[in-house]
Amino acid sequence: MVSIIIPILNEEKGIRRIQENLKTLEGEFEVIFSDGGSTDRTLERIDPDFRVVHSPRGRGIQMNTGAKEAQGDVLFFVHSDVLLKKDVLLQIPDKIKRGEAAGCLKIVFDSSHILMRICGFMSNLRVKLRRIVFADQGILIQKKLFEKMGGMPQMPLMED
């Protein structure tokens, strides 16, 4: 099973969009929203089909908190503004069987603006050439490996 972990903080305006997207996914998965102390109506807007865990503020800390609660053997960290293709989870078991312990998705921005398209191209090129990944691209990692490496750094920026 895949555990989708989403760190959130004051996301009331966009939280419904990702929940609707998550409901379209195929495969066996759980969703864990790791809240860093939202003060708006984010938590009220989370569907009861999804789990919420409470964490100190900080994306790395929130990701670690979600991972500790995860039931899956694969962790999939995404940001709350990411939209996933409905069959994305079906591809993960084959990659794990081939020995890939971690990975990411190709990023595509929902914008026709040239700068956003360049940003997406450069992000994907960075992954291909340098093996540097950000959670905007979705971070996939076997739970055992995540625990062995001690989780995400607990720093305010660039933890992922």
Place the predicted regions along the sequence by residue:
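A conserved acidic beta->alpha catalytic loop
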Residues: 35-43, 82-83
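Conserved nucleotide-sugar donor-binding
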Residues: 71-72, 136-149
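Short, well-formed alpha-helical segments that are part of the catalytic scaffolds
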Residues: 5, 10-24
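Short aromatic/hydrophobic "clamp" motif used to bind/position activated sugar donors
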Residues: 75
